[in-house]
UniProtKB/Swiss-Prot annotation:
InterPro entries: DNA_mismatch_repair_MutS_C, DNA_mismatch_repair_MutS_core, DNA_mismatch_repair_MutS_sf, MSSS, MutS, MutS2, P-loop_NTPase, Smr_dom. Its EC number is 3.1.-.-, 3.6.4.-. One of its GO terms (biological process) is negative regulation of DNA recombination. It comes from Ligilactobacillus salivarius (strain UCC118) (Lactobacillus salivarius). Endonuclease that is involved in the suppression of homologous recombination and thus may have a key role in the control of bacterial genetic diversity. This is Endonuclease MutS2. Homodimer. Binds to stalled ribosomes, contacting rRNA. GO terms for molecular function: ATP binding; ATP hydrolysis activity; ATP-dependent DNA damage sensor activity; endonuclease activity; mismatched DNA binding; ribosomal large subunit binding; rRNA binding. The keyword Chaperone does not apply.
Length: 786
């Protein structure tokens, strides 16, 4: 990337903004080296790092990288056997401490299943060096102070120094607090030449024995070391020398122990600097509300609602800028001060940011290209500092640009062809654009020459554009209008500002009809565009409301489905419960019938059997009769009369009404029996449904004639077979069989196993066994009842 365009587009100002978010000198050095890249993989990896940093900033508030200085020069000294001072060792200690903290931080991210694209791999390269790290951190504090724990000898020497200093202070306090204090300029103990002294007034020098070490600038105060503490000061000096010697020994020892790890320490410092740099990119992106760009290898640029990164997002006008897909050249026409130059700079600088791995100031889903180089000729005539730009300097720059461009270049021309005769300037501008197009480069050019308005219509892969101007307020809106060439507003502005109408009309007549027609066409296009934009806003609103309604309906539908499933589950549970209760009662009744059968030898009295059968039927009727309001109401509304044929629901038997037996009861003839039945248990039968009654019919227990002593299930599906077994066992018990045979076949054994499990749970079954070999063996089971 050519260096000139970085200066022209103020790339360094973006880097200056990044500096504010760094905490290490290594991170600042990476910003110094930051430049746009044209390598897809390099840009992609850099953006992935920025994304990881942005995710960490959002979730955890950033990567914990503290203030660190570069240790590169310190490590070089260690490589040649040098000894570092305590502050230099402290700087290395801070790097090791930061390394440990960063390792813990990323381990916590991993434990919490936080997903990152690249940083886990980068951080895995950090070397903790636990042993030397622990020793260094114990021996040297952050500010470079060597701690008492650095060695036993150092701790002992410092204890001796403390005792000696305390003794000296006690001796001197006798002077500062007693009657001798009047001889002192100040009643304080001070130090001169590393020895404790007293500030004695000049005239009382003879009152004190000892050594004079210094005097005040006025000569009125002498700093005297009293004779009584000379020996103590000498002892203190010896102890301080011993302390320095021990500290130097400790520093030398630590330096030697660190020397083998200079490569690891240098690598750690680089990674911490990189993390600081990533932190800065993420924080800068957050500060300007930037988003992650999509990389387009085809250089299909689409910046959605982009704004200049050096402008306040809240105040800057946002524009959609597109180039590369449908066209490779944009010609922005129209008068000055409309925002053409800032639009050019925005496109160029945002493209540089994206190719540097930075987030861009645009809405999400914006795309940037990957250009090998970006060229710009922007004189910025609106800037006072650049007001000396001339046609010659512009043309010199353009000549250099044309030499360096190819199909992977983006070229930005501001006021192309300006600074010379308008007719010649327009012709030059057209020729230059043709030359750029011939090399396949992407180009955006601004101009105020009306001749270039037709260029976008005549040239392939080229489109016109303009900066919107509000005719009502006579102010530019700074909005980019792709597809609409700029129009002159001079006549309208002049008339609004008070220029005589006749003068304006005369001026219009002096312009060509084609020019007037073009301006009217442009005005019509602008009006239609405004109408389309308003409709788009309205349709987007309708779409958003429809999407919200769809979401609500979908949510309610899913909620309804969940409620339905819950109700079905509850109903199934209740049904299963009822079935279990019913089966239990049925088993009890069947057992009772067997006892009755056994006690009666062969026949069961009709009344007992009917009563038992009625109780079985009642099990099936109970729930329905209680819950079915329609059936209850129908029963209440039916009119019963003597001699009516009725169904006794609880017994499942037909009968004939004889007479009323109370408010809600009837005497009913059931076979040879007469029974009193509650009216709610009776259901009137229509005459056509009845059959001729046989008088004196006797109900016998010999129902065994209708039940076979053998049940053959061969060829049946498992589910159907188990249902038949259940029904068959009940029927066999009611029929009074002592034993029956169930033929299930051998097959896979699944049906046999299911039948055996069923028989084990059936209370009416006494025991069971496989049939004899000549009667089917384990392909048939003989069941014995209680």
């Amino acid at each position: 990337m050519n260096k000139k365009v970085l200066k022209t587009l103020e790339y360094d100002k973006v880097k200056q903004n990044l500096y504010a978010f760094t905490t290490t000198s290594m991170g600042k050095r990476l910003i110094d080296k930051l430049e746009p890249s044209s390598d897809y993989d390099e840009i992609s990896n850099s953006l992935a790092q920025t994304k990881d940093g942005a995710d960490i900033l959002r979730i955890k508030g950033g990567i914990p990288v503290p203030n660190l200085i570069s240790i590169k020069s310190f490590l070089k000294r260690l490589d040649i056997g040098g000894t570092l001072n305590s502050k230099e060792l402290a700087a290395i200690g801070r790097v090791l401490r930061a390394t440990n903290e960063v390792n813990r931080f990323f381990k916590d991210l991993a434990d919490n299943k936080i997903k990152l694209e690249v940083l886990f791999d980068d951080v895995a390269k950090l070397e903790s060096l636990p042993e030397i790290s622990k020793k260094l951190l114990v021996s040297i504090e952050n500010d470079g102070h060597v701690t008492d724990d650095a060695s036993t000898l150092l701790k002992s020497i410092r204890q001796q120094i403390s005792v000696t200093e305390e003794t000296i202070r006690e001796r001197l306090n006798a002077y500062t607090r007693g009657t001798n204090s009047k001889y002192l300029s100040n009643a304080v103990v001070t130090i001169r030449n590393e020895r404790y002294v007293l500030p004695v007034k000049q005239e009382y020098r003879s009152k004190f024995g000892g050594i004079v070490h210094d005097q005040s600038s006025s000569g009125q105060t002498l700093f005297v070391e009293p004779a009584v503490i000379v020996e103590l000061n000498n002892r203190l000096r010896q102890q301080q020398v011993a302390e320095r010697e021990e500290i130097n020994r400790i520093l030398e020892e630590l330096s030697k122990e660190l020397a083998p790890y200079t490569h690891e320490l240098n690598n750690n410092a680089k990674i911490l600097g990189m993390l600081d740099f990533i932190n800065a990119k993420a924080k800068y992106a957050h500060s300007i509300k930037a988003t992650e760009p999509i990389l387009s290898k085809e250089n299909d640029v689409y910046l959605r609602q982009v704004w200049h990164p050096l402008l306040d997002m809240k105040k800057a006008v946002k524009n959609d800028i597109m180039i590369g897909k449908d066209y490779q050249a944009i010609v922005i026409t129209g008068p000055n001060t409309g925002g053409k130059t800032i639009t050019l700079k925005t496109l160029g600088l945002v493209q540089l940011m994206g190719q540097s791995g930075l987030y861009i100031p645009a809405f999400e889903e914006s795309r940037i290209g990957i250009f090998d180089d970006i060229f710009a000729d922007i004189g910025d005539e609106q800037s006072i500092e650049q007001s000396l730009s001339t046609f010659s300097s512009h043309m010199t720059n353009i000549v250099e640009i044309l030499k360096g461009i190819d199909e992977k270049s983006l070229v930005l021309f501001d006021e192309l062809g300006a600074g010379t005769d308008p007719q010649e300037g327009a012709a030059l501008a057209i020729s230059i654009l043709d030359a750029v197009g011939a090399k396949g480069s992407y180009v955006v050019a601004t101009t105020h020459y009306p001749e270039l308005k037709a260029y976008g219509f005549e040239r392939p892969n080229t489109i016109n554009a303009s900066m919107e101007f509000d005719a009502n307020t006579l102010q530019p809106t700074y909005r980019l209008l792709i597809g609409i060439p700029g129009r002159s507003n001079a006549f309208d502005i002049s008339q609004r500002l008070g220029l005589d109408k006749m003068i304006v009309m005369a001026a219009r007549q002096l312009t060509s009809q084609d020019s007037q027609d073009l301006n009217e066409m442009i005005s019509d296009l602008v009006a239609k565009r405004h109408d389309a934009e308003e409709k788009e806003i309205m349709y987007r609103k309708y779409l958003r409301e429809a999407e919200e309604l769809h979401h609500d309906l979908e949510t309610n539908f899913h909620q309804f489905e969940r409620q339905k499933e819950n109700m079905l589950e509850q109903a199934k549970e209740r049904a299963n419960q009822i079935v279990e209760e019913t089966k239990k009662k049925s088993d009890e009744l069947i057992s009772e019938l067997r006892k009755m059968k056994m006690s009666a030898a062969s026949n069961i009295e009709e009344g007992s059997l009917i009563d038992a059968q009625g109780r079985v039927n009642a099990l099936h009727q109970e729930t329905n009769l209680k819950k079915n309001k329609v059936l209850r109401k129908a029963k209440q509304q039916q009119e019963l009369h003597p001699n009516d044929d009725v169904m006794v629901n609880s017994y499942g038997q037909r009968g004939v009404l004889l007479r009323k037996a109370g408010n809600h009861a009837w005497e009913v003839q059931l076979g040879i029996l007469k029974m009193k039945i509650d009216e709610s248990d009776l259901e009137k039968i229509k005459v056509k449904d009845t059959q001729p009654k046989r008088a004196g019919a006797v109900l016998k227990s010999s129902s065994s004639s209708h039940v076979s002593p053998t049940l053959d299930l061969r060829g049946e599906r498992y589910e159907n077979a188990m249902v038949k077994v259940d029904r068959y066992i009940d029927a066999a018990v009611l029929a009074g069989y002592n034993s029956v045979t169930i033929i299930h076949g051998k097959g896979t054994g699944a049906l046999r196993t299911g039948i055996i499990n069923y028989l084990k749970q059936n209370k009416a079954v006494k025991n069971f066994e496989f049939a004899s070999p000549n009667n089917g063996g384990n392909g048939a089971t003989v069941v014995y009842f209680k």
